[in-house]
Amino acid sequence: MSTILDRIKAYKLEEIAARKAERPLVAVEDAARAAPAPRGFARALSTAAATGYGLIAEIKKASPSKGLIREDFDVPALARAYETGGATCLSVLTDGPSFQGADDFLRQAREAVKLPCLRKDFLYDTYQVAEARALGADCILIIMASVTDSQALELEAAASHWGMDVLVEVHSRDELARAEHLKSRLIGINNRNLDTFEVSLDVTRDLARRVPEDRLIVSESGLYTPEDLADLARYGARCFLIGESLMRQADVEAATRAILADPLTAQGGV
């Protein structure tokens, strides 16, 4: 029985083949070389985490499990709201079929703010890495559940070639062990199982203590309150990727500011 991730991979491979036929790699590489210099995604998170939390705020219109998340979807306005609200970096969905994302969303977001941007997509081919840089991405995502070890190494090497950082995403102890063979400092612990789309913060609680000390932990998915962040910070997570819970709010700037608040302050304590 195929999983959601299996179905995504199947259409992604078809999409990659179609894009290669439409736009040769040499043209994508020319665009990548002409793109503005990378902004330093990992550096920004590390700096923020040294004195507080590093927040990757996600621009996401829909998801396979929840359907449409936000109808009022003005990408530049959302990007500016996140920046003003205190986000460290942005994550922008560019996958169309499952997330109603688009390449242009990444371009729009990066042009609207000064924050480093992650291209949030399912990457299987180094063509997509060059494409990410051409779109202005400062970081790419490698999902260990969806690639082989050799693919992960190739994608990481391509990102390094283009001066981009890599967020390596894991959901299990086995995936974490595999991720440790990569050079990237950013380890994303996804609290969502990509086969079932079930979410549990216990995933971060279990895996965070197993992450090498020289890596920077980013907890992803299922984060709704300052208490959630404070809880996971006790396990070593100082950076967080948050999308849906912020996207559903009418005032995204205020919601961003609120989730970054100290839990005691948010409750009227000291």
UniProtKB/Swiss-Prot annotation:
Known pathway: Amino-acid biosynthesis; L-tryptophan biosynthesis; L-tryptophan from chorismate: step 4/5
Classification via InterPro entries: Aldolase_TIM, Indole-3-glycerol_P_synth, Indole-3-glycerol_P_synth_dom, Indole-3-GlycerolPSynthase_CS, RibuloseP-bd_barrel
This protein's record includes keyword Glycoprotein: no
Swiss-Prot/TrEMBL GO biological process terms: L-tryptophan biosynthetic process
GO MF term list: indole-3-glycerol-phosphate synthase activity; phosphoribosylanthranilate isomerase activity
Family matches, as Pfam families: IGPS
Keyword Glycosyltransferase assigned: no
Annotated catalysed reactions: 1-(2-carboxyphenylamino)-1-deoxy-D-ribulose 5-phosphate + H(+) = (1S,2R)-1-C-(indol-3-yl)glycerol 3-phosphate + CO2 + H2O
Keywords: Amino-acid biosynthesis, Aromatic amino acid biosynthesis, Decarboxylase, Lyase, Tryptophan biosynthesis
EC numbers, comma separated: 4.1.1.48
Gene3D superfamilies: Aldolase class I
Record-linked NCBIfam families: PRK00278.1-2 (NF001370), PRK00278.1-6 (NF001373), PRK00278.2-4 (NF001377)
Entry similarity comment: Belongs to the TrpC family.
Protein's name according to its UniProt entry: Indole-3-glycerol phosphate synthase
Organism: Cereibacter sphaeroides (strain ATCC 17029 / ATH 2.4.9) (Rhodobacter sphaeroides)
Gene that encodes the chain: trpC
